[in-house]
Each structure stands twice: as C-alpha cells, then as structure tokens.
C-alpha cells in the first residue's frame, strides 16, 4: 500500500479547443439510447487517462496529429459520438447525429511521465484539470459534446491521452472498443475496424409490458441523513500487490484462503475499512454494489461490437455493525452474493424498473459501489507508442471506487484502487487498511489463483 507524494507543480500550455468531425459524411438521424443507458445514475461524465513513454521508433511522430487524424477516421464508424443528446417524452434520451464533432485539445507540459507516475498514481489525479481541461459549457449531458479529448506532450517525449465520456453512451468495454478503433487507425490500419461497431440499443429496451423480476436493493429510495460536504472530500490511491493481498488473506482461517478471488477479498477488505472509517451507527443499513458486466452471460447474447452500457450494479444489504465487527468471511460472502445476482434476466429487470419507476438514481445512503476495470483493456491501448504505463479511470467519486491494473516501480503487478472519502474519514480508513495489509495473523500460506471476469 502506498500513496503519492504531494502534488507537483508544472505548467501546461493548451491550444484553443477544436471540434474534430468525422473524416467522411455520416448519416443525419435520431438514435434512441437503451433503457439501461439513459438511467439517472449514468447521466454524468467519467474521465479516463493513459500515459505513454517516449518510443525511439516513433521519433518525429506527433501524437497530437496522429490521434486527431485517427479520431476523425474512427468517427466515421462511431458517428453517434459526433452528435448531441436530446431528451424526448418521459425523459427518453436520444442522439441527434449532427456530426458536430467531439472536443479536442492540444497541449504541452513542462514535466516528465515518471514524475506523474510513481510507486502508485496520484490520488485523485490532482492535476487532472491540467491534463483534461473542463471546457466551459461542455460539462452538460444534453446538447454538449459527448467526448472531450486532450493530448498532452511532455518534455521527455512521453505524452498523455485523457478522455471524458458521457456515460450514457458507453460503459468501459464500449469505450475501450472505440479507443481500440482509434488506435488501429493511429497505427496505420485502413478500411473498417477489426470489430465493427453495433448500435442496436433496442436490445436493452424495456420489455412490453415491463416485468420487474428481482428486488433491486441498489435503487431503493432511502433518505440520506449524511451531512458530508462533497467539497471536503479527499482522494487517495492505494496499490495492492501480491504482498498486500497475502496479508489480507492471512485474516481468513486457513481453509477459507483459497476459495475466494482477489476481487472478492479486496472488495470485502475495502468495504469493512470504509464502513469503520465512516463511523456509521451499528444498526445503520449499508450496501455493497458490484458493477457487473452483462457481456458473456448465457441468457443475454450481447451482439459482438455492441458499445452501449451492458452492466448493472446489483447490491446486497447488511448492517454497519455486521460489516465492521463480523468475521471477514461474512463480508466476503456478502460480496459474492451481490456478484451472483447478475444475470441477463437481472439486467432486463433493471431496464423494466427504469421505465416503471421513472429512471431512479441508485441508492445513496449507506451505499458503496465498486467497479473493477482491471480486465477491460485500458492498459492495452496502443496508438503506436506501445502500451500505456497506466491506463484507466482518472478519478473516484464519493460513493464509487474504481480498480485498475498497475505495475509499481518494483515491477510488481497489482491493482490500484481510487478512493474518495471525507477528509476526517480518510485517515481512519488508512489506519484500518494498514491493519489489514501489514499485520499478518499467522505465517505464509499458499492459495490457488481464482480467475474472474471484469465486473464493468
């Protein structure tokens, strides 16, 4: 477990934002989003960032020019991203495919990649506003660009690719599909993308008549009595390598250590530490919501190339006192229950709930949402400069933590977790986490690797 040194000071020179349009004419039409896409809980912008080191074979190539031209080519196939969202009857979202383009910013910074990526990543990317400028008037959901991209060159020859996505358009795998297409064109590919994009958002439209077949704890409308001010929130990132995961597993009885995935163990640990840090009353209802990918579910049959949202975040309910004081096995089993709820039928039940209940926001009170992006593919996007030294979400949110794949300076592969908590709770969280990751209950042990699919 490690945290980043104090924020660096550096200067970024940005050109005026421009709009990148598809390189060829595209259809002018209206396209409805699915009833999973346009739920209230996805009507926000999510930032992703990738850092690339200098590559000798790419000397003389300007990443700004390469990305801008590849983006224009990709938008021919992903032309809805060049449009704007409008709202129809009953708040139904639609893309007006206007070919207005996506926002693009060219920038230079007097800093090096290695100064930004240390033993872990900067907590909350305190410099994110420098590498992904919030263009005034672009932050809305309706009538605004659906993508904002900034390419920043560093003095070392490395560079950063930062993108802000209107989450109603795509989930993480959908965004990776778009980025992969941009990367293919950046490396000189011609013709169509290797995976042709599929719109077909009616695939996840509500059924007629709607039929809510599950109890959805993640959408229960509960009065939030918490008074934390989001302005007092602080961000930190934590690295979990083999040593840290072994330490967490050592808190389980020997017979239990090999039967749970790293995701299950890590999520249970974080949920417990977070619950303790927030000082919640023991009887208070708490939830864990695990973002779960519907792709690959035998009862869903998602079309190959579909880039809309295909995930839900099924939740289980417990009490703060149970999570804080019960055995860690109990917490792991609760996490497993949440994951097990995700099926194709569950996702269709969510779509039906959205149109029946008026697209409710996910539960805020006592909820903790975790999203595992370690196997989504952000860390494999190659624009010609090789794989990024970091690729993944750029910021946590008060209720949401993201997991991303990361290799620290010692060459250890692991998971970096972005955490956002009130300032007063963050210190307690770190203290609780230290107990879990640095105190061994007994000696070393062996466990078999449990493979799990990404949950976003």
Curated annotation (Swiss-Prot):
The keyword Thylakoid does not apply. Its EC number is 2.3.1.-. GO terms for molecular function: acyltransferase activity. It comes from the Eukaryota. It is an enzyme of class 2 (transferase). Induction: Induced by ethylene in ripe fruits. The active site is at 167 (proton acceptor), 382 (proton acceptor). Expressed in fruit. InterPro entries: CAT-like_dom_sf, Plant_acyltransferase. Gene3D superfamilies: Chloramphenicol acetyltransferase-like domain (3.30.559.10). Keywords: Acyltransferase, Transferase. It catalyses: 3-(methylsulfanyl)propanoyl-CoA + butan-1-ol = butyl 3-(methylsulfanyl)propanoate + CoA; ethanol + benzoyl-CoA = ethyl benzoate + CoA; butan-1-ol + benzoyl-CoA = butyl benzoate + CoA; 2-(methylsulfanyl)acetyl-CoA + butan-1-ol = butyl 2-(methylsulfanyl)acetate + CoA. Transmembrane segments: none annotated. Pfam families: Transferase. GO terms for biological process: alcohol metabolic process; fruit ripening, climacteric; response to ethylene. Belongs to the plant acyltransferase family. Involved in the biosynthesis of volatile esters which confer kiwifruit flavor. Alcohol acyl transferase that can use a wide range of alcohols as substrate to produce esters. Exhibits benzoyl-CoA:alcohol O-acyltransferase activity. This is Alcohol acyltransferase 16.
């Amino acid at each position: 477990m490690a945290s980043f040194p104090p924020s660096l000071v550096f200067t970024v020179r940005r050109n005026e934002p421009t709009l990148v349009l598809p390189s060829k004419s595209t259809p002018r039409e209206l396209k409805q989003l699915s009833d999973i896409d346009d739920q209230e809980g996805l009507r926000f912008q999510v930032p992703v960032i990738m850092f690339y080191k200098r590559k000798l074979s790419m000397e003389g190539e300007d990443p700004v020019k390469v990305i801008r031209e590849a983006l224009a080519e990709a938008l021919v196939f992903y032309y809805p991203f060049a449009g704007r969202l409008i709202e129809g009857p009953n708040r139904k979202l639609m893309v007006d495919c206007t070919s207005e383009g996506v926002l693009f910013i060219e920038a230079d910074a007097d800093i090096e990649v290695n100064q930004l990526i240390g033993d872990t990543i900067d907590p909350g990317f305190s410099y994110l506003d420098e590498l992904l400028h919030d263009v005034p008037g672009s932050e809305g959901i309706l009538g605004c660009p659906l993508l904002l991209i900034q390419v920043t060159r560093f003095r070392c020859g490395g560079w950063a690719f930062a993108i802000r996505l209107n989450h109603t358009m795509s989930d993480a795998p959908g965004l990776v599909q778009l980025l992969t297409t941009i990367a293919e064109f950046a490396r000189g590919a011609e013709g169509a993308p290797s995976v042709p994009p599929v719109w077909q958002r009616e695939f996840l439209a509500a059924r007629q008549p709607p039929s809510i077949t599950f109890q959805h704890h993640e959408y229960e409308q509960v009065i939030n009595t918490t008074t934390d001010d989001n302005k007092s929130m602080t961000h930190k990132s934590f690295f979990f390598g083999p040593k840290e995961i072994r330490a967490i597993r050592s808190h389980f009885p020997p017979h239990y250590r090999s039967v749970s995935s790293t995701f299950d163990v890590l999520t249970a640990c974080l949920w417990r530490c977070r619950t303790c840090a927030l000082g919640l009353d023991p009887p208070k209802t708490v939830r864990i919501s695990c973002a779960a990918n519907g792709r690959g579910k035998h009862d869903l049959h998602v079309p190959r190339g579909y880039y809309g949202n295909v995930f839900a975040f099924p939740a289980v309910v417990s009490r703060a006192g149970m999570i804080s004081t019960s055995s860690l096995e109990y917490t792991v089993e609760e996490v497993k229950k949440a994951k097990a709820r995700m099926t194709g039928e569950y996702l269709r039940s969510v779509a039906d709930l959205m149109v029946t209940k008026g697209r409710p926001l996910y539960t805020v009170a006592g909820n903790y949402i975790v999203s595992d992006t370690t196997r989504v593919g952000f860390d494999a996007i190659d624009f010609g400069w090789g794989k990024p030294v970091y690729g993944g979400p750029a910021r946590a949110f008060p209720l949401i933590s993201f997991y991303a794949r990361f290799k620290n300076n010692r060459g250890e592969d692991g998971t970096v977790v972005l955490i956002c908590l009130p300032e007063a709770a963050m210190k307690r969280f770190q203290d609780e986490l230290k107990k879990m990751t640095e105190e061994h209950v007994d000696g070393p042990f062996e466990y078999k690797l449990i493979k799990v699919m990404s949950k976003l």
